[in-house]
């Protein structure tokens, strides 16, 4: 989860988020190099007193500044496309979780099991226990197993929502009348927080998401207690 005064990403807890973090660093390095070069050229132009007025065109320079941006765009596009295809890759899921957005709460259904569904509302500040997070805790957490492929089916009952968990690199729109799909796989157990990331009305800020990722054995014990 995020920490106070944090400037970077949250710690990655899924392979997709790790790839997104690497891509961010890769792109930021390219942007930094380009910005440094531009600032260096501008400083030279402002400080030098020499001018070259006899040259009307420079074929070599024009060739370089045409090819170089194309190469830079390719260096950015290739890893971006790779991650895009990884995020859209469909594998045989071990578990399917259907998520519905409402104004202003989430409902979840474990479609592989009968009668296993519940609503998840934000815990009011007056009901928080010591150590719990304001505006991020819910009355019913989503419990999922780690290191297993989980298919998320996401839609909405009313207006646009967006189911987002930053640590897992998941952000999928919940659109009324449309069923969107996302694949979720975590590399380690823990509690991960998210929020609705699409303006959906007056209480948009009060739609937290809490995932509790546990080993398979503990997940099976939770299932037995819920069924």
UniProtKB/Swiss-Prot annotation:
The keyword Protein biosynthesis does not apply. Its EC number is 7.1.1.9. It catalyses: 4 Fe(II)-[cytochrome c] + O2 + 8 H(+)(in) = 4 Fe(III)-[cytochrome c] + 2 H2O + 4 H(+)(out). Residues 1-14, 88-227 are mitochondrial intermembrane. Binds a dinuclear copper A center per subunit. It is a multi-pass membrane protein. The chain crosses the membrane at residues 15-45, 60-87. One of its GO terms (cellular component) is respiratory chain complex IV. Cu cation A2 binds at residues 196, 198, 200, 204. The keyword Acyltransferase does not apply. Residues 46-59 are mitochondrial matrix. It is an enzyme of class 7 (translocase). GO terms for molecular function: copper ion binding; cytochrome-c oxidase activity. GO terms for biological process: ATP synthesis coupled electron transport. Component of the cytochrome c oxidase, the last enzyme in the mitochondrial electron transport chain which drives oxidative phosphorylation. The respiratory chain contains 3 multisubunit complexes succinate dehydrogenase (complex II, CII), ubiquinol-cytochrome c oxidoreductase (cytochrome b-c1 complex, complex III, CIII) and cytochrome c oxidase (complex IV, CIV), that cooperate to transfer electrons derived from NADH and succinate to molecular oxygen, creating an electrochemical gradient over the inner membrane that drives transmembrane transport and the ATP synthase. Component of the cytochrome c oxidase (complex IV, CIV), a multisubunit enzyme composed of 14 subunits. The complex is composed of a catalytic core of 3 subunits MT-CO1, MT-CO2 and MT-CO3, encoded in the mitochondrial DNA, and 11 supernumerary subunits COX4I, COX5A, COX5B, COX6A, COX6B, COX6C, COX7A, COX7B, COX7C, COX8 and NDUFA4, which are encoded in the nuclear genome. This is Cytochrome c oxidase subunit 2. It comes from Cheirogaleus medius (Fat-tailed dwarf lemur). The gene is MT-CO2.
